[in-house]
């Protein structure tokens, strides 16, 4: 279950963007700009909590398996792992739609493997 504490902790893990207040703005794993108060909203800066290792594959709500992701990137990622499609990125002034194929980085994949290797 996602609690307010979890939302806060996941937000704190998201990337800091130079020139933007980190209490209000962060960058998701796909490079999209997200705003703290837009959690759960369909908005140009809205975001959701992504399960890096999808729940349908045995992933759960451990903080190491969670990350902030722009809602459109999360929806395009679906249950794909480790490779997935992202559709929004930040161009330095605003979010723009740009389809890209991405892969969860090696460090994160090793951590996920340690968490879920026996499942």
Sequence positions of predicted segments:
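Short cysteine-rich loop/turn motifs with clustered Cys
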Residues: 1-47, 70
């Amino acid at each position: 279950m996602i609690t307010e504490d979890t939302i806060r902790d996941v937000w704190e893990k998201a990337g800091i963007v130079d020139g933007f207040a980190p209490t209000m703005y962060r960058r998701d794993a796909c490079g999209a700009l997200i705003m703290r108060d837009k959690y759960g909203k369909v908005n140009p800066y809205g975001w959701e909590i992504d399960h890096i290792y999808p729940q349908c594959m045995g992933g759960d709500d451990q903080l190491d398996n969670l990350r902030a992701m722009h809602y459109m990137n999360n929806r395009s990622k679906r249950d794909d792992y480790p490779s997935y499609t992202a559709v929004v990125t930040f161009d330095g002034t605003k979010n723009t739609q740009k389809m890209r194929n991405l892969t969860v980085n090696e460090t994160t994949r090793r951590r996920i493997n340690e968490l879920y290797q026996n499942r």
